[in-house]
């Protein structure tokens, strides 16, 4: 696991391209890049323009960048307070040329980490990503609540792009898009769900200050298992 801190999205794209080239050439092992991005919206290969609710001019006024990228999925939003993970993994070397299995591994790793943190999490059939398990949550009403988005690219069976886990970012940023093209889904975060599960003490400044590190450590542990087994 490599923690890169806050990294501009364009710089992260270049870093991934170099990392994929190094992995293909056998110069480096599999890697997990963890970072945050300044406010940015990305459009995947399956994006519907209707799911971008604010035009490019409006996004510039808000200080939000816009990128079209070579990953699966629709539109998503990144900002500080969200943990982004880019696994650079040789699926062929693992003996599993199966992108769908890779997606399920990412989901499993995030679910395991969230459960360790005290957030009940699950998959929802038919959708990629990780959601709050409402049946085990303090709040059981309302729409499905999505806490992590996933979209990957693959070059000669080496993966790039990956996942975005909402830790404690300002969720209002998602109002500029229809996240992942899912109209009947509410975006949530680890901080919001912990406050529901544990009460106001979960938002104590000292606990929040440690939350980012706790999440990174939990994700790194779970992904180490999921991406190598």
Regions found by a protein language model. Name each.
Residues 1-144, 176, 201, 205-209:
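N-terminal lobe of the biotin/lipoate ligase/transferase fold
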Residues 46-47, 105, 137, 149, ...:
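Generic serine detector
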Residues 52-55, 147-167, 171:
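Short, conserved beta-strand/beta-arch hydrophobic-aromatic motifs that form part
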Residues 92-94, 137, 157-159, 172, ...:
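Generic "edge-of-domain/loop-turn" microfeature
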Residues 153, 164-229:
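C-terminal accessory segment of soluble enzyme catalytic cores
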């Amino acid at each position: 696991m490599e923690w890169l801190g806050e990294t501009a999205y364009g710089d992260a794209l270049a870093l991934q391209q170099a990392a994929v080239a190094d992995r293909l050439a056998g110069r480096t092992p599999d890697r997990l890049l963890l970072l945050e991005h300044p406010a940015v919206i990305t459009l995947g290969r399956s994006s519907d323009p209707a799911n971008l609710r604010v035009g490019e001019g409006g996004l510039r006024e808000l200080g939000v960048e816009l990128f079209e990228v070579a990953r699966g999925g629709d539109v998503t939003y990144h900002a500080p307070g969200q943990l982004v993970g880019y696994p650079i993994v040789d699926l062929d070397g693992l003996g599993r040329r199966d992108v769908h299995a890779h997606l399920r591994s990412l989901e499993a790793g995030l679910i395991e980490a969230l459960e360790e943190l005290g957030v009940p999490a699950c998959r929802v059939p038919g959708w990629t990503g990780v959601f709050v398990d409402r049946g085990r949550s303090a709040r059981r009403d309302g729409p499905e609540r999505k806490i992590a988005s996933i979209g990957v690219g693959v070059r000669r069976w080496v993966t790039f792009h990956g996942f975005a886990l909402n830790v404690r970012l300002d969720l209002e940023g998602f109002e500029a898009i229809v996240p992942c093209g899912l109209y009947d889904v509410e975006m949530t975060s680890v901080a919001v769900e912990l406050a529901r599960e544990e009460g106001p003490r979960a938002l104590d400044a000292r606990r929040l200050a440690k939350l980012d590190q706790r999440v990174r450590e939990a994700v790194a542990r779970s992904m180490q298992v999921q991406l190598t087994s």
